[in-house]
């Protein structure tokens, strides 16, 4: 079985989230992935927990932020696909399968994202995907809006052909 995906989790003092995050990844229906945690110099017991649970981890000496950590993870990944997660995430059992299915639909797709629902308010969106204006301004779709409004992909049923 070929591993196709590396799931990179940035962690900084996130021990209180780690167990639930890892358990949700262990429950995936798609088996062809590896989990790699990049720890940003945690001091809350995360380092010991990751070692005790034998989680594949790169330990950084200081906090490099989310982008610094995931960039280290991306450089270490040896798979065609990478998924980037924060440590305070729980995913449903089809998450990896759906992400791999979505990106595999066309060689022209270079990035996919999922709906993110607020953990403590599961009827509200945290993020329904990043959007960019023609002027290059970035914004998040759906923040704080009802989750039920974001069931379909933003461009569901629309084909865009190059000129």
Residue spans for each PLM region:
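Short aromatic/hydrophobic "clamp" motif used to bind/position activated sugar donors
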Residues: 82
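Short beta-strand/loop segment that forms part of the nucleotide-sugar
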Residues: 33-41, 58-60
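Conserved short acidic donor-positioning loop in nucleotide-sugar-dependent glycosyltransferases
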Residues: 13, 25, 40-41, 64
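Conserved donor NDP-sugar-binding/catalytic core segment of glycosyltransferases
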Residues: 90-133, 137
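Acidic helix N-cap motif at the loop->helix transition within catalytic regions
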Residues: 44-52
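Short, acidic, metal-binding catalytic loop of nucleotide-sugar glycosyltransferases
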Residues: 23-32
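A recurrent flexible, glycine/aromatic-enriched loop bordering the glycosyltransferase active site
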Residues: 125, 137-139, 145-163
């Amino acid at each position: 079985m070929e591993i196709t995906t590396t799931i990179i989790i940035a962690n900084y003092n996130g021990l209180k989230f780690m167990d639930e995050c890892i358990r949700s990844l262990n429950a995936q229906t798609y088996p062809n992935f590896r989990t790699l945690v990049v720890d940003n110099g945690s001091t809350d017991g995360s380092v010991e927990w990751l070692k005790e649970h034998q989680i594949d981890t790169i330990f950084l000496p200081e906090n490099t932020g989310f982008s610094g950590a995931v960039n280290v993870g991306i450089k270490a990944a040896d798979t065609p696909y990478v998924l980037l997660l924060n440590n305070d995430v729980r995913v449903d059992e089809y998450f990896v399968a759906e992400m791999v299915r979505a990106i595999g639909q066309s060689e022209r797709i270079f990035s996919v994202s999922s709906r993110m629902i607020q953990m403590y308010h599961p009827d509200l969106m945290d993020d329904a995907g990043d959007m960019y204006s023609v002027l290059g301004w970035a914004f998040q779709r759906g923040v704080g809006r009802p989750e039920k409004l974001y069931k379909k992909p933003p461009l569901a049923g629309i084909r865009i052909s190059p000129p």
